[in-house]
Every structure is written in C-alpha cells, then in structure tokens.
Amino acid sequence: MGSKSPEGHNQAPHGAPNALDKPANPAVKAQNGSGSADLDRGTISNDDDDADDDEKETQINGSSNAGRIYLFPSRPAKFQHRPTDTPSTPEKKKKKRKRSKKKAKPTEAKQTSPPRVPLSTLFPSGYPVGELVADDRTSRVTDEETRYNSRLWDDGFLADYRQAAEIHRQVRQYAQRELIKPGATLSSIADGIEDGVRALSGHQGLETGDGLNAGMGFPTGLCVNHVAAHWTPNPGAKEVVLEKSDVLKVDFGVHVNGRIVDSAFTVAFDPVYDNLLEAVKEATNTGIAHAGIDARVSDIGAAIQEVMESYELEIAGKSVPVKAIRNITGHNILRYHIHGGKQVPFIKNNRRDKMEEGEVFAIETFGSTGKGYLDDDFGIYGYGRNEHVPATGLRLASARSLVKTIDANFGSLVFSRRYLERLGVKSYHLAMKNLIDNGIVESYAPLVDVKGSYTAQFEHTILLHSGGKEVISRGDDY
C-alpha cells in the first residue's frame, strides 16, 4: 500500500514510529519383516514341519543313502509329494499367520478452491519461510546480536509474519487463477480476496475485536489504468466491470497479531502492456536487491529509477517511455501501522535515512505512461484512526458510538465503508463526517495520474535481520 509523499500528506494514523502496539496399536512383528514377505519367499516359520518330513523320509528309504527321494527345501512343505502306498499321518493344522495391518498414512490436508481451510490446519508444524537473501557484510550472528534481535522481535514475530505471508500467497494465486478475468466485477474480486484472507486466518472479524487478532491489514486496492493507488469498491457506488483492455493493480494486506504483510501485483490481458509490467517488476526487484541493513534510501531510489526508466512500450504505434511515479513511496511497517515513519522513494533523492536491523519494509514501485505524478481523485478509499487526537468532547451520540466501534474493531488499521457495513453499522455517514471534521479519523482518496495513461505496481514485504533479509511475501508468481 503506497505511502503518498509528504507534500500535504500526514502520515498519521499509521505514521507514528513511537505509537504503542495494539494488543492484539502396534503391528505384529513377522520373522522376515512381514507375514506377506514370508509367504512370497515360500517359507513358513514352523520348525516342527521340517522334523516330521525328515522322519518320514527315513521310514520310506530304510537308510539315509539308498534310494533317497530328494525333497527341495525351497518348496513349501505343504506342496511336497507323498507316496500313495504309505499311510499318511494327519498333518497338524497350521495356524494362518495374520498379516499385519499397515497403519493408514495420515491424509495430507489440501487447500480448497475457493480457499477456506485455515492455514493452521495445513501447516501444524510451522509456516513456510520466505526468500532468504544473505548479506555478506552482516551474515554473522553474535550472542549480543541474538539478544538484540530478541528485544526487537518477540517469539511470535516470525511465525506471525510467515503465516500472514502464506495467506497472502494462497489467496492471491487463487485470485489470479479464478477471480481476475475480463467481465468480472471489481466488487466480486474484492469479496473473493477478503473472504479468503479471513477464512485462512481463522478470524472472520465479526465479533468485537476479532479483526485485531488476524485478517485484513487494509482494504483491497483494485486500481484500473490511470488510477494508481487507493481505490476499493464501496457500497452504493456504480459497479466497475473489468475489461480486456484494462491494466489492474491488486494491492492487499494480511495481518496476524498486527504483523502486516503488504504485497501487490499488476495484471494485464493485452500483451501491449507487457513492458510496463516488466519495468515495474524489475524495478521492485532492484529495490529489494539494494535494500538491507545500513542501506541508504537515496541509493535505493536512484537504482530503482534507473531500471524502470530504461523501459518503453509501444501504444497505438507510438513509443511511450515508462516513468517512475515521484510522489508515492515505499515505507516501513510498524505493528498495526501499515505506514511507519520512513519512506523509500523510487526516484533520485537526497534523503539521508538508512535502513536498520530489525525493521520491516514494504518495497514497492509504481510506473506510469502518464506524467508520473499522482493527484487525489473524488471519493474515499478508506479511513484511519488518528491516535494522537482523543475522542473527547463529541456532541453527537452517533459519533461517540462510531468511534467506539472503530477503536474496538480496527484500532489503527485502515478500514473501508464495506467493513463497517459488514459489522452491521448503519446510518454512519453524518457521524463519520463529524469524526473527520474533529481530526479523530482521517479519510484517504484514490490517487490518479492523467486520464488515458496506464500505471503498474509491484510490491513485497521484507524483514531485515543480522544475517541479511527475508523477502517474506515472495512466491512463484512474482
């Protein structure tokens, strides 16, 4: 989820780096390995049978040397030939060896389509690790650094992040296969993604406070063509249908205990836009490659811009350069805050900020065929609670009630009108306006380039530790 550059943009409610965290039965053993194996070899482990056969052989021949009838030991005793003129002694009934029953292997749990199996069921022993990238400069772990990391990251930190990342991977790959197609409505895509996230996290978010345990990190962004960021379907708005000529950005967050994974991708059905998508994807990977402990954000931005703006595409017979969008940035992520206090531009800049050990960053880039600068559009993408403004002195009872609902269910997480109505909140428009007017809640508008242009976005979340970095949201798709 892109962070708009500082010009006229307050980072709160999720921009305060010092904000407080929001709590958030054994088988019988056979002689030769198994009963079935013994039968296959033609041997039955019963010593009395061999002794009986030796006695009968001596009685028939009168001596051990003359006229011996050879009995082949490899042939099972019950199949040996007996003379017809010799009365046979009744054979002992042999007990049939019971074949040991093989224990049924536990059936491996598999994800459904649409995804509805909670991730804790699929991965009872731990969640998949992201892409690990060692840093030669820092790939040593001393006792002091281990203690330092333990202060930064508690015992559940990595497990929470890896769970959130795997939820993101499974849901987005389902969306790419089944949801994102020409003719699909954007509301159906958003609902499909968000239903999947809530199901896999095991938290539907309908009970008070449940959404703070796990679920959506922010509303699903579905931005078409010149709309670059911060657009989501809203109740009562005109339905938007995805066209074959569209370029769609899909940006959504998943959190577990406030640890937010922020990752985004772009889909285009017309190959004319392939170079635009490739430029932005390569730019994001360049940013990830340059990111690390002590890396300067100015160096990262310059490297990203150089790669992205080396691409161009041909539209309607004209060569069009890809421009790095200059007033939206990547950002660090804090617990329950999608935007921390640090920004990572994708253009040359003079910032002196450095990345530090223990930090979490969303490395994202946006490219455009337009002017490469975004303006606020009409409408509202979502809302966020300003934690620095107390909810006191509100005259409207509906406003007091609404802010209690927001604090109890979203805390400092960004939410949308769809999320309020899902909780059964009604007639909230006047109350919301009152909260915004008092600075208690902030609203966020869609961000757009010029009409007729096309924009693309790719984004990953990375964790920085003493051994290097973990691209926690990396998948087979991007």
From Swiss-Prot:
Keyword check for Cytoplasm: yes
A single BP term in Gene Ontology: proteolysis
Binding site for substrate: H230, H339
Cofactor: how bound: Binds 2 divalent metal cations per subunit. Has a high-affinity and a low affinity metal-binding site. The true nature of the physiological cofactor is under debate. The enzyme is active with cobalt, zinc, manganese or divalent iron ions. Most likely, methionine aminopeptidases function as mononuclear Fe(2+)-metalloproteases under physiological conditions, and the catalytically relevant metal-binding site has been assigned to the histidine-containing high-affinity site.
Keywords: Aminopeptidase, Cytoplasm, Hydrolase, Metal-binding, Protease
Location in or out of the cell: Cytoplasm
GO MF, one annotated term: metal ion binding
InterPro entries: Creatinase/aminopeptidase-like, Met_Aminopeptidase_Type2, Pept_M24, Pept_M24_MAP, Pept_M24A_MAP2, Pept_M24A_MAP2_BS, WH-like_DNA-bd_sf, WH_DNA-bd_sf
Biased composition (Basic residues): 92-104
GO CC term (a single one): cytoplasm
Positions annotated to bind a divalent metal cation 2: D262, H331, E364, E459
Root EC class: hydrolase
Region of interest called Disordered, as start-end residue ranges on this chain: 1-124
Enzyme Commission identifier(s): 3.4.11.18
Composition skew (Acidic residues), residue ranges: 46-56
HAMAP family, per database record: MetAP_2_euk
Entry similarity comment: Belongs to the peptidase M24A family. Methionine aminopeptidase eukaryotic type 2 subfamily.
Name this polypeptide is given: Methionine aminopeptidase 2-1
